[in-house]
């Protein structure tokens, strides 16, 4: 169970880092938002899901 928690935390950190870089780039590009809107929403949904997963796994471990 601990390894699943560690992998979920790593995935959350990696997703946060990717979104931290990609979202401002998408908003700064001229046609970026219209062409990459679905990717940003998918990344945000993944991040929210990982936050809940880490919270659930943390409650099971502690």
From Swiss-Prot:
Its main location: plastid. It comes from the Eukaryota. The chain crosses the membrane at residues 8-28, 41-61. One of its GO terms (biological process) is photosynthesis. PSII is composed of 1 copy each of membrane proteins PsbA, PsbB, PsbC, PsbD, PsbE, PsbF, PsbH, PsbI, PsbJ, PsbK, PsbL, PsbM, PsbT, PsbY, PsbZ, Psb30/Ycf12, at least 3 peripheral proteins of the oxygen-evolving complex and a large number of cofactors. It forms dimeric complexes. May control the interaction of photosystem II (PSII) cores with the light-harvesting antenna, regulates electron flow through the 2 photosystem reaction centers. PSII is a light-driven water plastoquinone oxidoreductase, using light energy to abstract electrons from H(2)O, generating a proton gradient subsequently used for ATP formation. HAMAP family: PSII_PsbZ. This is Photosystem II reaction center protein Z. It comes from Gossypium hirsutum. The lineage of its organism: Eukaryota, Viridiplantae, Streptophyta, Embryophyta, Tracheophyta.
């Amino acid at each position: 169970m601990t390894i699943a928690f560690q992998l979920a935390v790593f995935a959350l950190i990696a997703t946060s880092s990717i979104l931290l870089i990609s979202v401002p780039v998408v908003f700064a590009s001229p046609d970026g938002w219209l062409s990459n809107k679905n990717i940003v929403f998918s990344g945000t949904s993944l991040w929210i899901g990982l936050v809940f997963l880490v919270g659930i796994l943390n409650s099971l471990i502690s």
